[in-house]
């Protein structure tokens, strides 16, 4: 392994360790995603506790921190195996962030960003797979699981030299979704539409406060 490849792997891990969910929530003065909602510092949980704008910001930042290191490594002509390790390092940083006590998210958006530089055709297929699964099922987690399962086959079709690293990345994502898989199997996983409805609905405390104001 060259010094440049090693440097890019370390750089990718450090980029991944920047938890955009935590930072966006701090800037927007929202609850800490690690202690509210599902407890997962990711875009889906931020959607639950902070709404669409904050969730989109987290999603974009998470994609970029996976895409940027891999894109730079690609431009530096780093071999496919080390490109794959760079992608995995970015996801490991997101999952086990050194800046946030090694407690991070599940790495889906970061993995998507890391895979994107392989090709826009692959990126489109991955996006379509996730969207179709979510639209048909209503489960964001199922979209991530199905995408992770199919990703190595897509990559094998378009760029076979990246199949092994992407397969490793998919295994990492599936491992992080172990609890979601169990909840899906038991029928206890929450649908993304329910999260949006709950955000729009007022809490009993808010309704009581409004009644008090009317009485005054």
Swiss-Prot record:
Q: How does it sit in the membrane?
A: Multi-pass membrane protein
In terms of domain of life, where is this protein from?
A: Bacteria
Q: Which reaction does it catalyse?
A: an acyl phosphate + sn-glycerol 3-phosphate = a 1-acyl-sn-glycero-3-phosphate + phosphate
Report the transmembrane regions from the record.
Answer: 4-24, 56-76, 80-100, 112-132, 138-158
Q: Is-annotated flag, keyword DNA-binding?
A: no
Q: Any idea which GO molecular function terms this record carries? A: acyl-phosphate glycerol-3-phosphate acyltransferase activity
A Pfam entry, by short name: G3P_acyltransf
Asked if the Swiss-Prot or TrEMBL record annotates the protein with the keyword Metal-binding, the reply is: no
Annotated localization: Cell inner membrane
Main subcellular localization, coarse class?
A: membrane
Q: What is its EC number?
A: 2.3.1.275
Q: Please state the pathway this protein functions in, per its UniProt record.
A: Lipid metabolism; phospholipid metabolism
What is this enzyme's class at the first EC digit? Answer: transferase
Disulfide bond positions: none
Q: Which InterPro entries match?
A: G3P_acylTferase_PlsY
Report the GO terms under cellular component: plasma membrane
Q: Which UniProt keywords apply?
A: Cell inner membrane, Cell membrane, Lipid biosynthesis, Lipid metabolism, Membrane, Phospholipid biosynthesis, Phospholipid metabolism, Transferase, Transmembrane, Transmembrane helix
**GO terms for biological process?**
phospholipid biosynthetic process
What job does the chain carry out?
Catalyzes the transfer of an acyl group from acyl-phosphate (acyl-PO(4)) to glycerol-3-phosphate (G3P) to form lysophosphatidic acid (LPA). This enzyme utilizes acyl-phosphate as fatty acyl donor, but not acyl-CoA or acyl-ACP.
- Record's subunit section: Probably interacts with PlsX.
Family annotation (HAMAP family): PlsY (MF_01043)
Q: Name the protein family.
A: Belongs to the PlsY family.
Task: Please identify the protein, giving its name as recorded.
Answer: Glycerol-3-phosphate acyltransferase
């Amino acid at each position: 392994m060259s010094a440049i490849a090693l440097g890019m792997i370390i750089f990718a891990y450090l980029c991944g360790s920047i938890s955009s969910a935590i930072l966006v929530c701090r800037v927007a003065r929202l609850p800490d995603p690690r202690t509210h909602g599902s407890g997962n510092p990711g875009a889906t949980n931020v959607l639950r506790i902070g709404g669409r704008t904050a969730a989109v910001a987290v999603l974009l930042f998470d994609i970029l921190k996976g895409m940027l290191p891999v894109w730079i490594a690609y431009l530096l002509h780093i071999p496919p195996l080390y490109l794959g390790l760079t992608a995995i390092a970015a996801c490991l940083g997101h999952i086990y962030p050194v800046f946030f006590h090694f407690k991070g998210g599940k790495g889906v958006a970061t993995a998507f960003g890391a895979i994107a530089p392989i090709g826009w055709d692959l990126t489109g297929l991955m996006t379509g797979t996730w969207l179709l699964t979510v639209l048909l099922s209503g489960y964001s987690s199922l979209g991530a699981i199905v995408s992770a399962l199919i990703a190595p086959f897509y990559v094998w079709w378009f760029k076979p030299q990246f199949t092994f690293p992407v397969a490793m990345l998919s295994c990492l994502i599936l491992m992080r979704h172990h609890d979601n898989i169990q909840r899906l199997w038991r029928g206890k996983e929450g649908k993304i539409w329910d999260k949006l409805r709950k955000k729009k609905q007022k809490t009993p405390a808010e309704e009581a406060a409004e009644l008090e104001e009317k009485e005054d």
